Amino acid sequence: MHTGGETSACKPSSVRLAPSFSFHAAGLQMAGQMSHSHQQYSDRRQQNLNDQQASALPYNDQIQQPLPNQRRMPQTFRDPATAPLRKLSVDLIKTYKHINEVYYAKKKRRHQQGQGDDSSHKKERKVYNDGYDDDNYDYIVKNGEKWMDRYEIDSLIGKGSFGQVVKAYDRAEQEWVAIKIIKNKKAFLNQAQIEVRLLELMNKHDTEMKYYIVHLKRHFMFRNHLCLVFEMLSYNLYDLLRNTNFRGVSLNLTRKFAQQMCTALLFLATPELSIIHCDLKPENILLCNPKRSAIKIVDFGSSCQLGQRIYQYIQSRFYRSPEVLLGMPYDLAIDMWSLGCILVEMHTGEPLFSGANEVDQMSKIVEVLGIPPAHILDQAPKARKFFEKMPEGTWNLKKTKDGKKEYKPPGTRKLHNLLGVETGGPGGRRGGESGHTVADYLKFKDLILRMLDYDAKTRIQPYYALQHSFFKKTADEGTNTSNSVSTSPAMEQSQSSGTTSSTSSSSGGSSGTSNSGRARSDPTHQHRHSGGHFTAAVQAMDCETHSPQVRQQFPPGWTVPEAPTQVTIETHPVQETTFHVPSSQQNVPHHHGNGSHHHHHHHHHHHGQHVLSNRTRTRIYNSPSTSSSTQDSMDVGHSHHSMTSLSSSTTSSSTSSSSTGNQGNQAYQNRPVAANTLDFGQNGTMDVNLTAFSNPRQETGITGHPDYQYSANTGPGHYVTEGHLTMRQGMDREDSPMTGVCVQQSPVASS
């Protein structure tokens, strides 16, 4: 026992000497040890006596008396099948099945309870807005419901953060409409009221609905929801891409979309409007009719006017401009950036910059375009979110934290290769196709790069974009012919001797289901010009557009005078286009130079007149160019001619410049895109000769924009264009750029 005491003394723990007997010896004196030893001896003796008594009992009674060790053992054992170890190993699958059964049984029970009238949860949802709304502030749409004894609700066709869009039939106007139902919440109502104000402002300046902006018919309050009634439109461009299995549409069709979009942006840039859309993307560009290429821009819910910017976080990420990513002030140029991204996506089928977040987005932009200029990053509040400044003053892209994503070196993912300029288009899929030559792709690439300029101040503006050679038919190349469209506000002049001017234009841009307010071609309409009639025979179409009546956005550096000189150019049988040319800017610097004259003899002329192609002189583009316009059909597998011969002649008034004694003449021909259609079958082609005359020795440069110079003549004069559209069939037919695309009649919300 003494030994045990020593062991206990040097080991601060309890030593178990018998079942249920232990003592702690730390700090005990010898007397204490002896006392404990005596107690231990007494307990053992008592235990031995108990054992002897138990052994004297009969055998059966001994079994009923458990031994001391048996007292701690369980009297009954669980079923081995229910043991946790077995359930989590051998019977693991059974365990999971049981869990699922219990879970789904509870879920089903809750669902059944929810169906009952006594469900407090259901009662809570039903009380929103007297039972008309759900708990998300959205109106509960009921198919077949009739509103205000006028609108019959057909179905829900769209949903977003703003609310919902339903297809409805307007009994009063006997037409289908799309009704945008705003959430019953103050913040959404306030934003929607801004949208209504902007839409009404645009409608006021676009009474004939020819600028590719969705038409707001009316708005009203219904059961505490603001409702916006729009014309019914068709697919959006994302749906169109999906129908191509994301392989993209032809370059010809991309051109038609591009020209309409540039015209729409030119309209939004009108000084009285100055509207920034702030959310341009394929989903917000809708076809008017599933069989035509006319489009309209929708969803102005995020829009604002210049000077009234209220949001910093705008634009969908894939189409977000660098200035927005960098937290810099923005203007109308952000929409041009978005358009550049959209056009590439429409042709390649894939987003150009598909960032998963803002850092990834900027990194993908840098892959293609390189590091933004230092003067931009030096002023950008959020520059250090994406870049780091080197001691020498240059900027480099920050390394990603995770290190998992690897990007190509800045500027090495060339747009040239993405478009397949020299390799037959994206993925080589356009090799050998008409209208997809290297020259066509080079023009497209150049336009895109101008749209994707890092510097918003030098990014191409709609006015100049519409004059880009991508939209012009060339005489010496077989490009942009049968399906191309050139209705830009071109200022084109070439040598000849004539005194009259005319411009040819097709129509397009209306809803396929609504013809309200449309001015149609009048073949006998008399214009107030000295040159005769503008005659045209145009087949009736589901979707029309007209040449715009533009309050022209002036080139950079121009100011609007109090009494501008008017230059009137008649561009359509039923309307005229007036541009205001500031008198203070009419005397612009002249650049003298000689250029080669390209003569293009067309096969069809009125009265045997010889027509020369016009010569456009720019710093970048000096190829002869003419304009063509088409009005095709998307009828699959059929040839459909929608226009017959069209000839015209108009006269433009001349403007004179007196500050230096020289007299100048400039014609601003603004002829936005025709209602060119998605070519789903073989179509007849149409040729247009556009000729304008000027002094070959004097050219006028427009101040404020270094990239373009345009011709102007000295001395009073007139401009002439003689257009003749001929329908050619047989060998000249071109395969449809969208052959094989399935078109389904499933209208998309117009906003």
Swiss-Prot record:
CDD domains: PKc_DYRK1 (cd14226). The histidine-rich domain (HRD) region is intrinsically disordered and promotes the formation of phase-separated liquid droplets that enhance its ability to phosphorylate the CTD (C-terminal domain) of the large subunit of RNA polymerase II (RNA Pol II). It catalyses: L-seryl-[protein] + ATP = O-phospho-L-seryl-[protein] + ADP + H(+); L-threonyl-[protein] + ATP = O-phospho-L-threonyl-[protein] + ADP + H(+); L-tyrosyl-[protein] + ATP = O-phospho-L-tyrosyl-[protein] + ADP + H(+); [DNA-directed RNA polymerase] + ATP = phospho-[DNA-directed RNA polymerase] + ADP + H(+). PANTHER family: DUAL SPECIFICITY PROTEIN KINASE, DUAL SPECIFICITY TYROSINE-PHOSPHORYLATION-REGULATED KINASE 1A. One of its GO terms (molecular function) is protein serine/threonine kinase activity. Dual-specificity kinase which possesses both serine/threonine and tyrosine kinase activities. Plays an important role in double-strand breaks (DSBs) repair following DNA damage. Mechanistically, phosphorylates RNF169 and increases its ability to block accumulation of TP53BP1 at the DSB sites thereby promoting homologous recombination repair (HRR). Autophosphorylated on tyrosine residues. Residues 494-517, 623-633, 642-660 have a biased composition (Low complexity). Belongs to the protein kinase superfamily. CMGC Ser/Thr protein kinase family. MNB/DYRK subfamily. Its EC number is 2.7.11.23, 2.7.12.1. It is found in: Nucleus; Nucleus speckle. Keywords: ATP-binding, Kinase, Nucleotide-binding, Nucleus, Phosphoprotein, Serine/threonine-protein kinase, Transcription, Transcription regulation, Transferase, Tyrosine-protein kinase. Residues 585-613 are annotated as: Histidine-rich domain (HRD). It comes from Xenopus tropicalis (Western clawed frog). The active site is at 279 (proton acceptor). It comes from the Eukaryota. A motif (Bipartite nuclear localization signal) lies at residues 109-126. The keyword Oxidoreductase does not apply. It holds the Pfam family Pkinase. Residues 59-81, 104-129, 477-532, 580-667, 730-751 are annotated as: Disordered. ATP binds at residues 157-165, 180, 230-233. Residues 59-68, 477-493, 611-622, 742-751 have a biased composition (Polar residues). GO terms for cellular component: nuclear speck; nucleus. This is Dual specificity tyrosine-phosphorylation-regulated kinase 1A. One of its GO terms (biological process) is protein autophosphorylation.
